[in-house]
């Protein structure tokens, strides 16, 4: 999956991608599941990770809404 496909999955809150990747938001320091009900962040503030552990190791914390 490329960046645009992952971002589109976030925009549509597509739960079928749960566990395939995690989205981290640089402006908030939080990482989420693709189906998170939180507002979709701006493209320039998003990084994608294959595991939650990778997002945590880069300093992001788990979202309190979707509990990844």
Briefly describe each language-model feature range.
Residues 1-68:
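Mature, structured domains enriched in cysteine- and short glycine motifs
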């Amino acid at each position: 999956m490329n960046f645009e496909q992952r971002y589109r999955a976030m925009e549509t809150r597509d739960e079928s991608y749960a566990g395939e990747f995690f989205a981290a938001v640089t402006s908030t320091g939080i990482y989420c599941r693709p189906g998170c009900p939180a507002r979709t962040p701006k493209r320039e503030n998003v990084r994608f990770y294959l595991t939650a552990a990778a997002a945590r190791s880069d300093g992001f914390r788990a979202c309190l809404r979707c509990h990844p």
